Design a protein with these regions (language model features):
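Charged, glycine-rich intrinsically disordered N-terminal tails and low-complexity linkers that flank
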Residues: 1-93, 210-212, 218
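Metal-dependent nuclease catalytic regions and adjoining charged, substrate-binding loops involved
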Residues: 7-9, 198-202, 206, 212-218, ...
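A non-catalytic, helix-rich entry segment at domain boundaries
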Residues: 59-213
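Non-catalytic protein-protein interaction segments used by genome-maintenance enzymes to assemble
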Residues: 184-266, 429, 540-544
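Metal-dependent nuclease catalytic cores in nucleic-acid-processing enzymes
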Residues: 255-289, 450-453, 457, 552, ...
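OB-fold nucleic-acid-binding modules
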Residues: 360-410, 461-512, 541, 545-547, ...
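OB-fold (S1/OB) nucleic-acid-binding surfaces
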Residues: 393, 403-435, 503-536
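Short nucleic-acid-contacting surface segments enriched for D/E, G, S/T with interspersed K/R
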Residues: 435-453, 491, 537-555
Length: 589
């Protein structure tokens, strides 16, 4: 099955604590690049290539969802498909334009008007040619082992290939309103032939069609490791001939600067497939390059290699989970052969940008435009009531009596986490896992006088909260030892100021179909950066109008945490944002 659900809970969407194929390849290229881009979450200006890659892949899958009527030859089938490619090329160009124009931060030296619809059409035609190689082989082999089963109307796969007129597969169907009452039927000319008759060209298209992400399904469609610490999202799965072949689609060509990452990416997918399937081993892996119409083949890992990858990937994930604490250093102290949370890389690996920035190369390194670079070279001064980002407390010890336990229940990211309640005198405070699986033995703690060590202080809905993770500990407190910080004295908000160095907005749909939106930007105070987020109604036009290089001050930002790093949140009622003027005049959002 190319789609599953997390075995131990947690989000179906991307998680900063799970190992993914793209995260792995980034980590292997440059450790600090992974840390800043993936864990800290700092972005760079959007490029046309990033938009193009997504819309082209979606357009190719939209074409393959179609179901042809009777065809006399492969040439007739190809002509039918090329007409669909013409329509999808224009549609993809239009979607790309809208995505580009709605991006808050994009390359100033790029213009969507330079993108040609014909370029989209060429890539789609090349992708179809690679698919037609499968169709031809399917026809030559008389439909493969599943022809007669298909003709009976019974899918040979647990999760069918997405196609027009067929019911889609939702990973969590109980979250979809009125799923069984929906009518997914749609007119199409396809019909199966009688049993034992020769295969027809439209049947070869129907059988050879790979699995891909169904565009009608708003829920994430991923595989999840049985222990929950790795996940992957496949592009295509070819399986018509009884063998499993995993395919990754690339819009460029095999000589691109990121091409070396393809093998690592496919090895990860093959490993994850093997660890999520008792049967149906991977036969091989392929990369389809749409610019050059290339099919690059790779052998599937052996059993010995898969066992070695278990240890390798688990070790990498553990390193990722423990990297960084609190606010993150930027620029780096110096360049190092082993870049990490404090040391920079040499900037030569594909994708390197922020990770190569040091105190000595501010004038040349990094992805900044002229405005942002000038502001960062000027530096940043901090005045009362604001404090440096590096001085925001990240760990506290708090004692009291555990009086209640609950969960797992959704947190503010809609992730299922465990919770409990701590009482000290008249004061009470909620305790919660910092993220799913971060403190699995929370409910094993004795409901007595305890001390919680290395907890992360924060606030949610105006109520103080303690977050616990793998660095935290709960134990019985001895009578003669210090009680730690009093609940009423916990610091749950922060006043900070600095320069906006990155910004982006993300929109999506929850498992139940309800929309969500989040705007995030990164604030730099001259030495450190932190992520600042606003959700839903807290996203104002004033926030959306901010751009990298703007100087701002946040008063009363909520203190939160994401994967052990500070994440400040904007409370629409109590957080004030001040944009810099000569006198730093207050302007509330």
């Amino acid at each position: 099955m190319p789609v599953g659900t997390p075995p131990k809970g947690g989000p179906l969407g991307r998680s900063r604590s799970r190992l993914s194929a793209s995260g792995l390849t980034t980590y292997l290229r440059c450790t600090r690049q992974w840390y800043l881009n993936r864990k800290v979450g700092i972005s760079s200006p959007k490029t046309i290539g990033q938009v193009l890659g997504i819309v082209i892949e979606d357009a190719l899958c939209n074409i393959m969802m179609n179901r042809p009527g009777p065809m006399e030859s492969i040439e007739e089938l190809r002509e039918w498909a090329e007409e669909l490619a013409d329509e999808q090329a224009q549609s993809a160009w239009d979607i790309g334009l809208e995505t580009w124009e709605n991006s808050l931060w994009k390359r100033t030296d790029s213009d969507w008007s330079t993108v040609e619809v014909q370029d989209f059409k060429n890539k789609l035609s090349n992708g179809l040619e690679l698919f037609f190689e499968e169709i031809q082989r399917c026809y030559d082999e008389n439909g493969g082992p599943y022809l007669e089963q298909f003709r009976t109307g019974v899918e040979p796969y647990n999760i069918p290939t997405p196609k027009i007129g067929a019911k889609p597969h939702f990973p969590v169907p109980e979250k979809v309103r009125s799923l069984d009452a929906r009518d997914w039927s749609k007119e199409h000319p396809f019909e199966w032939m009688e049993p034992d008759s020769p295969i027809q060209w439209n049947e070869a298209w129907e059988i050879a069609r790979p699995w891909f992400k169904d565009p009608r399904v708003h829920q994430p469609q991923r595989m999840f490791h049985p222990e929950g610490w790795a996940a992957g999202e496949l592009d295509l799965v070819l399986r018509w001939d009884g063998n499993i072949r995993l395919v990754d689609i690339k819009s460029g060509h095999s000589g691109g600067k990121f091409s070396e990452s393809l093998q690592h990416q496919l090895r990860f997918y093959a490993w994850l497939w093997e660890r999520t399937h008792d049967q149906s081993p991977v036969k091989n892996m392929e990369g389809w390059y749409l610019s050059s119409k290339e099919r690059i083949l790779y052998e599937a890992p052996s059993n010995e290699e898969l066992t070695s990858m278990d240890e390798e990937f688990f070790s990498i994930n553990n390193i990722m989970r423990t990297m960084g604490e609190g606010a993150s250093i930027l620029p780096a102290v110096a360049e190092s052969e082993t870049p990490d949370t404090t040391n920079a890389c040499d900037g030569t690996s594909p994708g390197c940008g922020w990770c190569s920035l040091t105190q000595s190369n501010m004038e040349t390194a990094g992805p900044m435009d002229d405005k942002l670079r000038k502001k960062m070279i000027e530096g940043n001064s901090i005045s009362s009531p604001c404090v440096p980002l590096g001085e925001i407390p990240s760990r506290v010890n708090v004692s009291g009596n555990l009086i209640a336990q609950w969960g797992p229940l959704p947190n503010h990211f809609n992730e299922p986490v465990l919770g409990a309640m701590l009482q000290a005198g008249e004061a009470t405070i909620a305790i919660e896992e910092a993220e799913p699986g971060a403190f699995l033995h929370l409910h094993d703690s004795q409901q007595t006088n305890v001390i919680i060590e290395n907890a992360l202080p924060g606030v949610w809905r105006d109520q103080p909260r303690l977050y616990v993770d793998q660095h935290s500990n709960i134990r019985v407190r001895q009578e003669d030892e210090p009680k730690g910080t009093r609940i009423g004295l916990l610091r749950t908000r922060a006043n900070v100021e600095g320069v906006v160095v990155a910004i982006r907005q993300q929109n999506g749909v929850r498992l139940d179909g309800k929309p969500w939106s989040m705007l995030s930007f990164h604030l730099w105070d001259g030495e450190h950066i932190v992520e600042v987020v606003a959700f839903g109604s807290a996203i104002s036009e004033r926030l959306r109008s901010m751009r990298p290089g703007d100087r701002i001050r946040l008063i009363g930002a909520e203190l939160g945490w994401r994967a052990g790093l500070i994440q400040l949140r904007i409370d629409v009622r109590k957080t004030r944002i001040e944009h810099q003027t000569p006198a730093f005049t207050t302007k509330s959002i």
